[in-house]
């Protein structure tokens, strides 16, 4: 009986550990995706002044 109980507890803890690890990996992936989105947004926003300058130059040149 002790061996059976030990086995049940061990398997339960192993399953719980695996679930916690998967949850942690999922949260880490979501965090990294959010960081990637922020990085892309920063790159896009940094291009806006260059685009404005290019349009301004074209308008000034042809206008």
From Swiss-Prot:
InterPro entries to which the protein is assigned, alphabetical: Frog_antimicrobial_propeptide
A GO cellular component annotation in the UniProt record: extracellular region
Tagged with keyword Secreted: yes
Residues of the propeptide: 20-41
Tissue: Expressed by the skin glands.
Pfam families reported in the protein's UniProt record: FSAP_sig_propep (PF03032)
Modification type Phenylalanine amide: residues: 62
Keywords for this protein: Amidation, Amphibian defense peptide, Antibiotic, Antimicrobial, Cleavage on pair of basic residues, Secreted, Signal
One BP term from GO: defense response to bacterium
Subcellular location: Secreted
Signal peptide: 1-19
Stated role: Has antimicrobial activity.
Annotated family: Belongs to the frog skin active peptide (FSAP) family. Phylloseptin subfamily.
Protein name: Phylloseptin-Az1
The species this protein was found in: Pithecopus azureus
Classification of source organism: Eukaryota, Metazoa, Chordata, Craniata, Vertebrata
């Amino acid at each position: 009986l002790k061996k059976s109980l030990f086995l049940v507890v061990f398997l339960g803890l192993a399953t719980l550990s695996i679930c916690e690890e998967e949850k942690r990996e999922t949260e880490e992936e979501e965090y990294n995706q959010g960081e990637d989105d922020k990085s892309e947004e920063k790159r896009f926003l940094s291009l806006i002044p260059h685009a404005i300058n290019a349009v301004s130059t074209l308008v000034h040149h042809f206008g």
